[in-house]
Amino acid sequence: MKQAINKSKRSSRRRLPPIRSGEIIDYKNINLLRRFISEQGKILSRRMNRLTSKQQRLMTIAIKRARVLALLPFLNNEN
């Protein structure tokens, strides 16, 4: 019984959206794109990002464009 209460309480919490309403997903917005790639330079999954599927698609396209234009690295091998 206690677990059921905890689960319902946990699901009722609203998290802040990862992208604010004024932010535009664009390949030139490097600060925004860096929040959605790992330390190795990989694109984080949609579950980790808490993005909608449409936002994730736009984010992936923007990150790939930024990589091609050398605004973001393909890999981050600083070891």
Swiss-Prot record:
A single Gene Ontology CC term: mitochondrial small ribosomal subunit
Record-linked PROSITE patterns: RIBOSOMAL_S18 (PS00057)
Species for this entry: Physcomitrium patens
Q: What is this protein called?
A: Small ribosomal subunit protein bS18c
Gene3D superfamilies per record: Ribosomal protein S18
Q: Which family does it belong to?
A: Belongs to the bacterial ribosomal protein bS18 family.
Q: Which Pfam families match?
A: Ribosomal_S18
Q: Which NCBIfam families match?
A: S18 (TIGR00165)
- Principal subcellular localization: plastid
Picking any one GO molecular function of the record gives:
small ribosomal subunit rRNA binding
InterPro entries in the record: Ribosomal_bS18 (IPR001648), Ribosomal_bS18_CS (IPR018275), Ribosomal_bS18_sf (IPR036870)
Q: Where in the cell is it found?
A: Plastid, Chloroplast
What are the BP-aspect GO terms? translation
